[in-house]
């Protein structure tokens, strides 16, 4: 099939398609670089909460990863890891969240500048086991997590 551009042929759709393709191709390297950058999860505010929706048949795996997370935080030689552990609570809701179990991380106070990304903490603490642990962690999720940054409004105990 041969296309010609002329006043009657109207080649504007072709130029639009070409521009779209070039735009996608030119942005692909930038996206790949952004994805390759290490992930970190910081809580810049007073505290945070993370809602985790876990598959019913994967709760034991998730809880096993949480035990490894605690072990990794406690055995770290970095003082901020012990501070993180002191303010990090993991709750399990007795009610289902739809078809899934709900686990809630409550982080208060948040350690300013500390990385709360579980994959980074596990990789740091267990470099040879990290892939297997993190595969269990990833497979346990029914859907992504909801992350909420929090500012303390009032401490009712003080």
Where are these regions (language model features)?
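Divalent cation-coordinating acidic motifs and surrounding scaffolds
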Residues: 96
């Amino acid at each position: 099939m041969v296309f010609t551009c002329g006043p009657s042929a109207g080649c504007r759709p072709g130029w639009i398609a070409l521009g779209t393709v070039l735009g996608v191709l030119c942005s692909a390297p930038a996206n790949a670089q952004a994805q390759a950058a290490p992930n970190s999860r910081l809580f810049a505010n007073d505290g945070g909460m993370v809602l985790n929706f876990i598959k019913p048949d994967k709760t034991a795996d998730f809880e096993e990863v949480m035990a490894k997370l605690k072990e990794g935080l406690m055995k770290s030689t970095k003082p901020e890891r012990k501070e993180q552990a002191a303010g990090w609570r993991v709750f399990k809701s007795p009610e289902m969240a739809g078809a899934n179990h709900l686990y809630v991380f409550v982080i208060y106070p948040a350690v300013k500048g500390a990385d709360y990304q579980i994959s980074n903490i596990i990789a740091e603490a267990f470099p040879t086991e990290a892939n297997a642990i993190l595969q269990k962690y990833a497979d346990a999720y029914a859907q992504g997590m909801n992350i909420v940054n929090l500012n303390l409004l009032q401490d009712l105990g003080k």
